């Protein structure tokens, strides 16, 4: 099948997974002996009730498995026939894919806000790789596998006037394309400082650590990483006394939303759909001219009219609507883009916020006070030592004098 259709590794892995699940469900029954009723029984097992799956996400899984079965069984029964001329064998004949009314599997409330993205980047631990991945995912709008195939050499930094940006070459379903990076630049640089193979420009940008050091991450690994943050890291933050209550409120709402790598592309493309023409958005997203994917992303999740009315009535301004909490903090001294929460420039160490300035002044004041205290302590010790030394010397001189002279001096 690989030779006939040039399937990618991930696609082949997906087909193998579908066949494995089918075989296990039917008690490891031979594929040659499977019937149409067996296939329908497996597919019907994927159905879910309205209560458990109101957005009908199971239909996507149903159709995905069915397409894998169609391809496999056509090859199994007619492998001597040209792939384009193979007919459906009886085992998968007359089993249609299902249609879903929803344009997207996500509800409007499922999408993260820019403030929630900021909170995630701030509290996702000390793993610079994960921060970099998340920032690049929402900055580039790339598919998961496109991001994972990026190598260090694929990122080129550029400067226009006093502004810095980057371009990254990605490989997708429609071929190669160049994507600009803006808000994620500080996170990319931060991760590259700690990258285990940062000197090797051919190394994967998002590689494994510890046992899998240097290896390209899989999309399954990325999914597991996001689940780890949802199930372990962020719930603990709600009990952390050092986390401000305002941040805890945002985290509490965020934990009710999906944590997966795919929803980041939905967020990114929905945001860019507000400012890019459809033809430009297609090129940016890596969609062909006949692709129906824009129907999934271009509906703005039903809130564009609401925002327009809020703006018309003066409740919000256009500037407020486009506010981006993830915009880098540009250094006024060297123009280096820094993370939004940065207090000092990563390049020239210039102070970037009033808090940092106040901390610097306080640190200097504290340093002077410590030096002054040490000076006074040293001087007190020195005075005591000199006083003791003078006392000893006077005692020695008196001891050398004749008693009658001392008696005469004291009389």
Segments and roles (model prediction):
Residues 1-106:
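N-terminal core-binding DNA-recognition domain of tyrosine recombinases/integrases
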Residues 98-118, 174-186, 199-203:
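DNA breakage-rejoining catalytic core of tyrosine-based enzymes
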Residues 114-144:
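Basic, Lys/Arg- and aromatic-enriched nucleic-acid-binding interface segment
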Residues 140, 145, 149-189, 329, ...:
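Conserved tyrosine-mediated DNA breakage-rejoining catalytic core shared by Y-recombinases
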Residues 182-255:
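Active-site/catalytic core of tyrosine-dependent DNA strand-transfer enzymes
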Residues 223-283, 287-291, 299, 303, ...:
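Short, basic (Lys/Arg/His-rich) helix/loop patches that form interaction surfaces
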Residues 285-322, 350-354:
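Catalytic-site neighborhood detector that most strongly recognizes the C-terminal catalytic loop/helix
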Residues 347-362:
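Short Cys/His-rich micro-motifs in 6-15 aa windows
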């Amino acid at each position: 099948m690989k030779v006939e259709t040039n399937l990618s590794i991930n696609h082949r892995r997906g087909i193998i997974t579908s066949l494995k699940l089918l075989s296990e469900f039917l008690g490891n029954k031979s594929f040659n002996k499977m019937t149409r009723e067996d296939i329908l029984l497996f597919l019907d097992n994927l159905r879910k009730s309205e209560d458990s799956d109101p957005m009908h996400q199971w239909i996507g899984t149903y159709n995905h498995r069915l397409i894998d079965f169609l391809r496999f069984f056509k090859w199994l029964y007619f492998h001597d026939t040209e792939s384009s001329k193979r007919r459906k064998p009886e085992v998968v004949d007359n089993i249609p894919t299902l249609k879903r009314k929803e344009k997207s599997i996500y509800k409007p409330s499922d999408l993260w806000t820019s403030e929630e993205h900021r909170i995630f980047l701030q509290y996702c631990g000390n793993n610079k790789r994960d921060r970099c991945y998340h920032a690049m995912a929402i900055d580039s709008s790339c598919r998961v596998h496109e991001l994972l195939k990026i190598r260090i050499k694929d990122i080129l930094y550029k400067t226009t006037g006093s502004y810095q940006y980057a371009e990254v070459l990605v490989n997708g379903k429609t071929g190669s394309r160049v994507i600009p990076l803006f808000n994620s630049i500080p996170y990319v640089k931060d991760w590259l400082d700690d990258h285990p193979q940062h000197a090797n420009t051919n190394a994967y940008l998002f590689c494994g650590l510890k046992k899998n050091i240097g290896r390209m991450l899989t999309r399954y690994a990325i999914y597991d990483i996001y689940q780890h943050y949802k199930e372990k890291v962020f719930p603990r933050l709600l009990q952390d006394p050092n986390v401000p209550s305002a941040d805890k409120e945002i985290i509490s709402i965020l934990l009710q939303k999906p944590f997966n790598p795919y929803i980041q592309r939905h967020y990114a493309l929905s945001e860019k759909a507000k400012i890019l023409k459809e033809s430009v958005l297609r090129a940016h997203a890596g969609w062909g001219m006949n692709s129906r994917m824009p129907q999934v992303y271009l509906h703005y999740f039903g809130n564009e009219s609401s925002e327009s009315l809020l703006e018309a009535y003066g409740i919000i301004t256009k500037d407020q609507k486009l506010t981006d909490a993830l915009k880098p903090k540009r250094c006024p001294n060297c123009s280096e883009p820094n993370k939004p929460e940065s207090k000092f420039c990563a390049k020239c160490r210039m102070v970037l916020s009033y808090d940092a300035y106040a901390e610097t002044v306080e640190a200097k004041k504290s340093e002077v006070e410590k030096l002054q205290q040490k000076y006074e302590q040293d001087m007190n010790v020195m005075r005591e030592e000199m006083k003791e030394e003078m006392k000893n010397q006077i005692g020695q001189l008196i001891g050398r004098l004749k008693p009658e002279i001392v008696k005469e001096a004291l009389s």
